[in-house]
Amino acid sequence: MAAPPRRRGTPPPRPAAPARDTTPGYRGYLHLADVGDTYTSQEAATLLQLENAVLKRRLFAEPAPPLAPTGHEEEDLAAAPRRVADHFARADAAQLGDDAPRHLVVVGVYPTLENPYGNGFVHRRVKYFQAAGVRVDVAVIDRSAEPRSYEYDGVHVLVGRGAEAAELLRTRHYESVAAHFLVRSLWEPIQDALAGHRFFAYMHGFESRRWIRTVRNHRTQGQVDDAIVDTLERQRFWREVLDHPHGPERFVFVSRWWRRAAQEDMELVFPGQRTAIVHNVIDTDLFRFVPKDPEQRFRVLWVRSAANLNYGADLAVRALERLRDTPLWDRMQVTVIGDGKHFGLFEEAFADDANVTVERRFVVQEEIAALHREHGVFLVPTRLDSQGVSRDEAMASGLVPVTNDAGAVREFVDEDCAMIADVEDVAGLADGLRRLMEDPDLFLRMSRAAAARVRAQTSPEHTVDQEMALMGLAAGPGGRGEENA
């Protein structure tokens, strides 16, 4: 029976909010209908945004509380000149002449002999700078560290709780200063000492990310609450940095996608004239292309941290399990190397599979390059990537990546050089592996295309050279990165 005609003057019926997904299991997301089932989706989204905006305006009107004292402030201030002088005495004797341009890197972590993995990608930048004739000092600000100076792979590093980095800036003129993963504990000790220096903030993701990007990593309400508070603090922090007279001359993002995403996450605009895009460098000499044998399409490599679910360890396990019952499985050789909270997923799933090697350990760059030469396919699912350095390194070596269309991935790969599944699409990952194994010509064609893509986009001449020009450390077209691109 047809519905009776609506009487003139009667308002149209309100569209109901979409029904909740009642599928059991944790998915990390709520539904607009969880606000209340008497609201439309538009009403629910509007009330959440506007009420949230009012609360944030009140919160951000209050100055941020200062960092808690370390208890060493007076000692550090008194000792900083001596520590810096001792550092210079050792570093200057080993570096280039006084006419070489000087550059200071400020970070929270830097590699040591005991921990060679701490911000290794920053160290690779430093080595390229040194090779180009730049004198580089590295200042590590760690509020829990004992001040010291050490050398790592030809780089002189000064560690302190903040006073030492400020003393470096007051004592020596640098052509440029770069901070990676800028957070309040790095910013507060040096902000006043940056006067007269060209300062650049490198935006990799962690420092300007909203809690929802990593929601799957939170398992309790307390963890979610802490993550939300942390996001609010970051949003307030970046407003302070943007407005500070000694704030960054440029905010350097590793991808165009991350420039857009960071502005959405921090709910502010990084002015176009103060931003640049410079991708993380890939060492194409170490990760050099060696033509693949067609049989290497059956040799699959996963080498990555499994510290959180954004790295997709669970997706990789499920994709491989889908191939276990196919005729391809007996021809496959899978190598899984890594560590982290979720690495046990591999150990549990493949304990009885003779063709799957699972090793819980970290590997150095040289060994990763050797592993690349032995394999043909790089399984690298993801839920969030601002670039994807491990994927690009594998591509440079000629491995074909099998990944997800998440974050900035499409900025660095396409269907000519990678198998790209939708977000969370395990079947798509398995199908990508299957297609490569069933078509040797496709595998070889994509292998060559993957290596060519990296050399045309993220090799040193397209990254480090651009970066040095941007910061006035080398000649370049206008001394600029891809700002406003």
Which functions belong to the PLM regions below?
Residues R219-F251:
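Membrane-proximal helix-turn-helix segments that form the acceptor-binding/catalytic region
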Residues K292-Y311, V317-E321:
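Conserved donor-binding/catalytic core segment of Leloir-type glycosyltransferases
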Residues V157, D441-M471:
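A charged, aromatic-enriched C-terminal amphipathic alpha-helix characteristic of glycosyltransferases
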Residues L345-V363:
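Nucleotide-activated donor-binding/catalytic signature segment of Leloir-type glycosyltransferases, i.e.
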Residues A370-H375:
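Short alpha-helical donor nucleotide-sugar binding micro-motif in glycosyltransferases
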Residues R383:
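Aromatic "clamp/platform" in nucleotide-sugar-dependent glycosyltransferases that forms part
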Residues V400-T403:
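Short hydrophobic beta-strand element within catalytic cores of glycosyltransferases
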Residues E415, M419-V426, R435-P440:
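Conserved acidic donor-binding segment of nucleotide-sugar-dependent glycosyltransferases
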